[in-house]
Swiss-Prot record:
PROSITE patterns linked to this entry: GNAT
EC number in record: 2.3.1.-
Alphabetized NCBIfam families for the sequence: PRK09831.1 (NF007338)
UniProt cross-references to InterPro entries, sorted A to Z: Acyl_CoA_acyltransferase (IPR016181), GNAT_dom (IPR000182), N-acetyltrans/Recomb-assoc (IPR052564)
Gene3D superfamilies (UniProt xref): 3.40.630.30
Family: Belongs to the acetyltransferase family.
Superkingdom assignment: Bacteria
Name used for this protein in its record: Uncharacterized N-acetyltransferase YafP
Length: 150
């Protein structure tokens, strides 16, 4: 496994995080969603994203001095977790999620079909299946909750 370092988001990361998001949606999530859905999802409104990231706690996974994934949290809600497809199945998403699981009493996420098994491996449970609209396309996702077992 590569040496993964986790650090706080820096404004200079913005374009690389956008690229990771686009690649993750178009290459990884395309296994579970139609071309129309991917086209609707894989768009970035830069001003909205910058505003969202400013309101969030964001951590970036670094391998060989390059951002390869990121996670963002607003209070107890995981808003985004994306890994560059070149680095999937190498522990990047786990390295981003594990510190949150250790530090939070509860976490929630709206997980894609693609991400649902990953979150289940860490003890997240599906609260409900949802149909959500994004730019005219309808998606299935899952509202999931994590509570530590005591």
């Amino acid at each position: 496994m590569n040496n993964i370092q986790i650090r706080n988001y820096q404004p200079g990361d913005f374009q690389q995080l956008c690229a990771i998001f686009i690649r993750a949606v178009t290459m990884t999530a395309s296994q579970h969603y139609s071309p129309q859905q991917i086209s609707a999802w894989a768009q970035i409104d830069e001003s909205r994203w910058k505003e969202k990231l400013a309101k969030s706690q964001v951590w970036v996974a670094i391998i060989n001095a390059q951002p390869v994934g990121f996670i963002s949290r607003i209070e107890h809600y995981i808003d985004m977790l994306f890994v560059d497809p070149e680095y999937t199945r190498r522990g990047v998403a786990s390295a981003l999620l594990k510190p949150l699981i250790k530090s939070e009493s509860e976490l929630t996420v709206d997980a894609s079909i693609t991400a649902k098994p990953f979150f289940e491996r860490y003890g997240f449970q599906t609260v409900k299946q949802q149909r959500v609209e994004c730019r005219g396309a309808w998606f299935t996702n899952f509202y999931m909750r994590y509570k530590p077992q005591h």
